[in-house]
A protein has these predicted regions:
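Rossmann-fold cofactor-recognition segment
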Residues: 57-73
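Canonical Rossmann dinucleotide-binding motif of NAD(H)/NADP(H)-dependent dehydrogenases/reductases
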Residues: 2-39
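C-terminal helical subdomain
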Residues: 190, 194, 213-292
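Catalytic loop of short-chain dehydrogenase/reductase
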Residues: 100-103, 112-117, 147-186, 196-200, ...
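A short, exposed helix-loop element centered on a Lys and neighboring polar residues
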Residues: 133-134, 177
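Active-site loop of short-chain dehydrogenase/reductase
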Residues: 5-6, 62-63, 90-91, 140-154, ...
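The beta1-alpha1 cofactor-binding region of Rossmann-like NAD(H)/NADP(H)-dependent oxidoreductases
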Residues: 48, 68-80
């Protein structure tokens, strides 16, 4: 049995879904680079640090490596990937999870009535995911193996929170499709997949439920554990038929049924298809069109 660890990279892993995804990959024995900006617990109202996440990864059986990285900074991102390649020589799994999420997303009113900073999700969310994928793809194409995962959600197809939020989720799905198409046409064993997460039981959601248990308490029963999508990413990476998913947008709850993955106690989170009748968009697989 090989003692070489799978090298994974999870962006936005100080807390929330990113922290859980990194923890899950640690349970599968991966070397997990966790990035984010939070070094000290008091630096963010919701707590969590990249160091704490890395410690959890190692305690779970993997190797956690915390790297402070501002994904809005091209220099930070470039330096980070250079470090990973110098230390590991490969990148096997990339999970694009970093996004600029603010509490004001849930405020009432039109987008013009809320802070302009909500548009930061276009930079740390859309652009940051493209940049990270660009660097990771260099390694994956060269080694002819790899998986790029985008964390997305039903906001790609129906209104949730704000136009910037919806644009971010829709972009995750379309980038996965288009990148997957280019990997296919290049004949490479690299897959790009977008996963619709459900209501993830993050620190933020716990605060929402605690603020009004009568109104929001039902969210817990249908929620996903933060580790849930991490287990899905591992199942995809190790699936011999991974190529069949390349370019796809998958509802995480449905993917879990296929792989036999559940939350604690065997609980299966509901699918958006069943609960809301919402499904991912079917993109056209026309041959790539390029000038020249």
């Amino acid at each position: 049995m090989s003692d070489i660890r799978t090298v994974a990279f999870v962006t936005g892993a100080s807390r929330g879904a990113g922290q859980g995804i990194a923890h899950a990959l640690g349970q599968h024995g991966c070397t997990v680079y966790v990035t984010g900006r939070t070094l000290n617990p008091g630096d963010h109202a919701l707590g969590g640090t990249i160091g704490a996440t890395a410690t959890q990864v190692t305690a779970a059986g993997g190797e956690g490596i915390a790297v402070q990285c501002d994904h809005s900074s091209p220099d930070d991102v470039r330096a980070f990937f250079a470090r990973v390649m110098a230390e590991q020589g490969r990148i096997d799994i990339l999970v694009n999870n970093a996004a600029a999420v603010y509490d004001e997303l849930s405020l009432p009113g039109g987008f013009w009535e809320r802070p302009l900073k909500l548009g930061d999700m276009i930079d740390v969310g859309i652009r940051s995911s493209f940049d990270a994928s660009w660097y990771a793809a260099q390694a994956m194409v060269a080694q002819n193996d790899g998986l790029i995962v985008f964390t997305s959600g039903a906001g790609a197809e129906h209104y949730v929170f704000s136009p910037a939020y919806g644009a971010h989720k829709a972009a995750m799905d379309k980038m996965a499709f288009d990148m997957g198409l280019e990997f296919d046409h290049a004949g490479k064993n690299v897959a790009a997949v977008s996963i619709w997460m459900g209501a993830v039981m993050t620190e933020r959601l716990r605060l929402v439920i605690a603020s009004d248990p009568v109104k929001f308490g039902a969210l817990e029963a249908g929620s996903e554990e933060p580790e849930f999508t991490g287990h899905l990413a591992w199942a995809l990476y190790t699936d011999p038929q991974r190529a069949a998913r390349n370019g796809a947008t998958c509802i995480g709850a449905e993917l879990a049924r296929e792989y036999g993955i559940t939350c604690a106690g065997g609980r299966a989170p509901p699918s958006y298809r069943d609960s809301h009748g919402v499904v991912p968009r079917a993109f056209s697989r026309l041959a790539p069109v390029r000038a020249g």
